[in-house]
């Protein structure tokens, strides 16, 4: 290897005399760096992480139902014996709770599918004028009664589709439409009350309304008395359905 390196240098420099050549013991230092590659890391400190063991991301690796191979790692269930199934005849019958909450998904008679006559026997939806007279608690209770009724209607519809009964869909949809109308009316009344409260809050913050004005208006409301109604009864006939209120 040193003789080949010196010969290459002689060819490159065009026949240089042997006197100008370096000593023979310096020949390894004259080798080209491109001919040799470092097989070890030169720096003592490096940010490159050391190659570690690769984790298997598949938890079911090697598990096969065809070849009946179980998991590679022992599980905690294998330490305890599995319970044996009990025959249906030997099972103890659990008493049913008549006040269970899931009975709310069925009617009072607890039938899975009511008849079309029972589905059609319902009244009209509540109007907005009627709901404006109700309190907050009454509106809350009425809304959740509508939710409970819609759950019962959906349960009966699912049972009809499962059993392919072929009847009761029209009556059920009509009943559900009526209940949804009541819910929409309740939302409209609550929306009106929210807008009224928002307007009152803005008036109070702007200074256009004060509690003193409310006391004056309240005093005037108590002082006001509506006039008595004058109803003329026909001569010779006394009407019992219309009565004249006593004069104050």
Curated annotation (Swiss-Prot):
Q: Which UniProt keywords apply?
A: Mitochondrion, Ribonucleoprotein, Ribosomal protein, Transit peptide
A GO term, aspect molecular function = structural constituent of ribosome
Q: Which GO terms describe its cellular component?
A: mitochondrial large ribosomal subunit
Query: Is Ribosomal protein a UniProt keyword of this protein?
Result: yes
Protein localization? Mitochondrion
Q: Which InterPro entries match?
A: MRP-L47_sf, Ribosomal_uL29_mit
Which range is the signal sequence, renumbered to this chain? none
Q: Which GO terms describe its biological process?
A: mitochondrial translation
User: Main localization of the protein?
Assistant: mitochondrion
Region feature Disordered, mapped onto this chain: 77-107, 223-248
What is the similarity comment for this entry?
A: Belongs to the universal ribosomal protein uL29 family.
Subunit text: Component of the mitochondrial large ribosomal subunit. Mature mitochondrial ribosomes consist of a small (37S) and a large (54S) subunit. The 37S subunit contains at least 33 different proteins and 1 molecule of RNA (15S). The 54S subunit contains at least 45 different proteins and 1 molecule of RNA (21S).
Q: What is this protein called?
A: Large ribosomal subunit protein uL29m
| Organism from which the protein derives | Ajellomyces capsulatus (strain NAm1 / WU24) (Darling's disease fungus)
Gene encoding it?
MRPL4
